[in-house]
Amino acid sequence: MYVLGVNHAYHESAACLVHDGRILAAAEEERFTRVKHAKPARVDNPHELPVNAIGYCLARAGITLADVGHIGSSILPGRRLRNHLIPDHVTDGDWGSQAGETTFHDRLRTVPARLREMGFTGRFHWLSHHLCHAASAYYPSPFDTAAVVAADGIGETASTMLAHARGTRLSPVGEIDYPASIGFLWEKIATYLGFSEYDACKVMGLAAYGDPGPYRQHFRRLLELLPDGRFGLDNGVLRFRADDHSGLSALFGLAPRAAHEEVTGDHANITAALQAVTDDVMLHIVEHAALSLGTRNLCMAGGVALNCVTNGRLSAAGWFDRLYIQPAAHDAGTALGAALLIWHHVLGGPERDPMRHAYYGPGFSAADIETALRQHGAVYKRVDDISVEAAELLADQKIVGWFQGRMEFGPRALGNRSLLADPRQPATRERLNRVVKNREDFRPFAPSVLAEHARDWFEIATPCQASDFMLVGYRARHPQKIPAVVHVDGTSRIQTVHRDLNPRYHRLISGFHRITGVPLVLNTSFNDREPIVCTPGDALATFQRSNIDYLAIGDFLVEAVTSR
């Protein structure tokens, strides 16, 4: 039975195709349209489907929508409609207002008919947003039982769900409703500090430069820890649904930062305090989960689960022995969760498919790649061992675009759509930030490390699979040897690389290790202010306009591109 899951209501639109419980394909719409997050979250566009991602999934399986038995959407329109009953600071016709929520609901309801027009003849399902997040975390995990925490901005009316999983059953045991939302708190602080609502990674990177002390008490006025793992937020100050930072300005005694203004020590201190209270809240939730559910396994999803600093705290806290985090923890992952919920809860499917990697996106043949090389006027050669060639270039301080195999599903580049560099040189970080990626200097870079050497280079008390997906931060043992991948706080957000899961990438890092004595490389996403590259054409276009030294694409090494 083919089951398709789709996420389309807000942002990070995506599709995932499952066959008899096995994940066949999953991709985000942004990778095809080249528009970050696919679309903004608005009340007037929830019916816009990820048609390119759907088309890719079907093509990968060699089927059409007529062959799909079930489609699940990761939203419950009726429950979401009740948002206008929540007292809030809203703009008429927008989120939270009766007119806005009615528009959102009515347009959502057109989705089944749209799918019918595309050829779908099976059964359609509306599904709980946070239950889809939870399903995406538990069903691909290696556990037979687990506590599951899903935390983000908002789903229908909730921001956080705690669930208990056993076998193929996944049961919600509690929710925390809006406006108690860690995800929205991060969005609000990000915009207050002059970034966009999608810039949580920038805020997290900046936090390491600050001291939480000066502003921690200010956040304590905003946030209260409550019994049973709950928490509350003062939306009278935050005003999540209004373009209004006056409450935060009064609280912090600091005017909102304009995007062009300098980032100051006060801004860094505010982000450090935000990170500290996020750690407190998530530890509070996880402690309750451990004590109430009686399991030593924890699964996580939702945008908050992309916070590698908090994940490092949770991993070291001791409440759980094993941690699994869905690599597509953001809303795109709910497409996967929707498909798996239908397979297990509706169809009663017993088979589970452990998700040990995230390589479910498009891949391209050597013929596809060489056609693109010729079309772009590339200066290239075919090499016998691309991994060895790339390792030698990295050891010579070159920056290499690395395009191999199937694209990753999720926001992290995990060795198939990556920019690689030598971690030993501090100048590498500055060059990548300023000349290649065109981003802020305070943002760190991550290392990909051979799994068999990870504990020699990082303080990993309890290994967890989340490190395979670059989702946990650990303290570096030898920061002076790898300064380009160690943040100012002495930690690194590592990706552990296994030979059996990505042999070509493992061989590259092994080659670099033999040359330099360092079993890791700098790995950042292959993009420049746009979505991660998907196709050979995307890779060549980014290579041409960026200051990347070489492009290793399939078995081909590209030195230059002369035309588009």
Residue positions per predicted region:
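Flexible beta->alpha loop and helix N-cap segments adjacent to enzyme active/binding sites
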Residues: Y2, N7-K36, R42-N45, P87, ...
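Short HxH-centered metal-ligating active-site micro-motif
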Residues: N45-R60, I71-I75, L508, T516-V518
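N-terminal phosphate-binding loop and adjacent alpha-helix
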Residues: F32-I63, M282
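Short beta-strand-loop/turn "lid" adjacent to the catalytic site in phosphate-handling enzymes
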Residues: Y56-P112, A135-S136
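Structural motif corresponding to the C-terminal cap of alpha-helices
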Residues: L58-A61, Y138, T278-V281, I285-L293
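Adenine-nucleotide phosphate-binding core of ATP-dependent small-molecule kinases
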Residues: A259-I285
